[in-house]
């Protein structure tokens, strides 16, 4: 019961209008240094760039020195790459809501509903299960009847290492393929 409460306390967020919502990415939030980074292809003041800042000071290309520093700290300077590396998908959870919260003499069970892009956030869910000592079952559905399934977390330490390594290798291979185009 306490483990679930600790999890809920961390992921329950109140917005500027006083409305509560849930955000699983609070368990492993994107680093502040990557928050205002935009990526793609842009030309700012005649400088072509693939990453830039957009804030109250306007648009500024990201300097190579900053990129190198972020790569050293986080393995990337691109927010989407960080999310894939740490959550297992492009976004963590979106539009998350608590469907049920049941406490019995045997324990506590909560059910959440959330959306995610391009697959379940398997790394995020596995890391949450490990961090909070929870058993998580995720039932997922791909839009337009493209598939469905069920995943259980946490994985064993051996499976966690193997799956994370396979995921990282696949991402690196995909990035290399894109760079070669």
Give the residues covered by each predicted segment.
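Intrinsic low-complexity, intrinsically disordered or marginally ordered coil/linker segments
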Residues: 1-181
């Amino acid at each position: 019961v306490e483990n679930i409460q600790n999890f809920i306390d961390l992921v329950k967020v109140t917005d500027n209008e006083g409305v509560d919502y849930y955000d699983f990415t609070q368990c492993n939030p994107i680093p502040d240094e990557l928050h205002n980074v935009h990526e793609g292809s842009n030309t700012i003041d005649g400088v072509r760039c693939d990453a830039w800042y957009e804030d109250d000071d306007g648009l500024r290309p990201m300097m190579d020195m900053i990129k190198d520093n972020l790569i050293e700290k986080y393995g990337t300077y691109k927010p989407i790459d960080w999310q894939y590396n740490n959550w297992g998908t492009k976004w963590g959870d979106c539009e998350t809501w608590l469907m049920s919260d049941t406490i019995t003499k045997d324990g506590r069970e909560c059910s959440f509903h959330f959306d995610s892009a391009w697959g379940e956030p398997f790394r995020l869910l596995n890391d949450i299960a490990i961090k909070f000592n929870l058993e998580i079952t995720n039932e997922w559905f791909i839009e337009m009847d493209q598939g469905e399934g069920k995943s259980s977390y946490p994985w064993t330490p051996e499976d966690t290492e193997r799956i994370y390594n396979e995921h990282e290798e696949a991402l690196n291979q995909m990035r290399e393929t894109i760079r070669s185009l």
